[in-house]
Amino acid sequence: MAVRVLLVEDMKQMQGVIVDLLSAVGDFQVVALVATEAEAKLWLSENPDAWDLAIVDLVLDQGSGLAVVPRARDARQGKAEIVVFSDYASGGIRAHCEKLGANAVFLKSESREFMDYCTAFGGLAAAAPVA
């Protein structure tokens, strides 16, 4: 069963890169691709159980991924993973994202570590019993 991904990223080129990375490491299906905080919050409120992994950039066209992370956390109440993948996820920001509910935080320059995380998550999701 494919891992259902909510991708919150405003840069078209980066959207393509992330989709390509996901397809290279496992069975991932991007079920929603949004570019703003408002779009992400709306999608989460309308589709609270339609995703397994949220990948969130912090700097968006409008708004911030920092407001999306807790909304995603509240929507799935620990039943999904939230990963921040951003150029702005340095020291204090990383800790703040984790406090808000992110399971992992990666700089975009840490693409290898991000891929390793997604590979491991995809393997765990594939091994989980279907409810």
How would you label these PLM feature ranges?
Residues 12-32:
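Two-component/phosphorelay signaling modules centered on CheY-like receiver
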Residues 33, 59-63, 99:
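Residue-level signal for the "D+5" position in two-component response regulator receiver
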Residues 67, 88-105, 112-115:
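Alpha4 helix (beta4-alpha4-beta5 surface) of REC/receiver domains from two-component response regulators
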Residues 84-85:
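Hydrophobic/aromatic residues positioned on beta-strands within the core alpha/beta folds
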